[in-house]
């Protein structure tokens, strides 16, 4: 009987050395996001973070999200450096809705076979997203799971914790008829609706490299999600924000009602903005009904803010100074009976 060949973890498809190389590669990206509250360095069993001392009654706000099937397009077109920004954006934009300042972020990267170059690109993007939002990247998990994912395909999940003063939590309770609604422009479809995007590409047999408004269609589709944290923190400090809605999965119809009292509805002026070209392309090439567009995509609006009507001019000026494209998109009205909570005129 011959002696069996000794087996290693690498023989089973898990390369510990590759994982160590990744950790070494991302140290600079992590260091760039460090906040003064962070204790310790990357690599501990748990990451430590103090609460900022400026808060009297700090309330922690948590969120988790992914990038969805936008990843499929990114993998197919080898565009790995911006999906990390998407991942952070989907989490921190949810936190800012409550008025919370993001504190720290953790990521989960799962793959069948770890490609160090690809993973480094992804995590560097996560670091960029954290930098844009003032959030510390304090840890994560890289899971190499042969047999669970095909080849070098990967999936991402993000986890974020923020903090808000208890008295300053934004929960929509101050929203009232007569409030104005301000829209903040999106950078594209962000990270929602990509199963429909991919279906439109399939049925239309369109060339993703075709020109659309001066750049390839695929570039429009893979544009990273806009992060609104820093500009909205300044708006919250300077104005009287009653509510904010992050326009993600479910579009206008489902996200705006999440922050409205039962006796209020949002009346949106559909002619107050022009849809970016990518949404018109999707609608036309997929023969998608307008209602379905507003249900699936942000249609050019990444965030909606409710505030008193007399605060609009100052708010728009502040947002413009922060580099945001913002405009008056509608108003809050009294809701009667079982009326829908969102009306687009």
UniProtKB/Swiss-Prot annotation:
Q: What is its main location?
A: cytoplasm
Reaction equation(s) it catalyzes: 2-formamido-N(1)-(5-O-phospho-beta-D-ribosyl)acetamidine + ATP = 5-amino-1-(5-phospho-beta-D-ribosyl)imidazole + ADP + phosphate + H(+)
Q: What is its EC number?
A: 6.3.3.1
Instruction: List, alphabetically, the GO terms of the cellular component aspect.
Output: cytosol
One of the GO biological process terms: 'de novo' IMP biosynthetic process
Report the pathway entry.
Purine metabolism; IMP biosynthesis via de novo pathway; 5-amino-1-(5-phospho-D-ribosyl)imidazole from N(2)-formyl-N(1)-(5-phospho-D-ribosyl)glycinamide: step 2/2
**TM segments?**
none
The entry assigns this protein to a family as follows: Belongs to the AIR synthase family.
Question: What name is this protein filed under?
Answer: Phosphoribosylformylglycinamidine cyclo-ligase
**Which species is this UniProt entry from?**
Shewanella sp. (strain ANA-3)
What's the gene?
purM
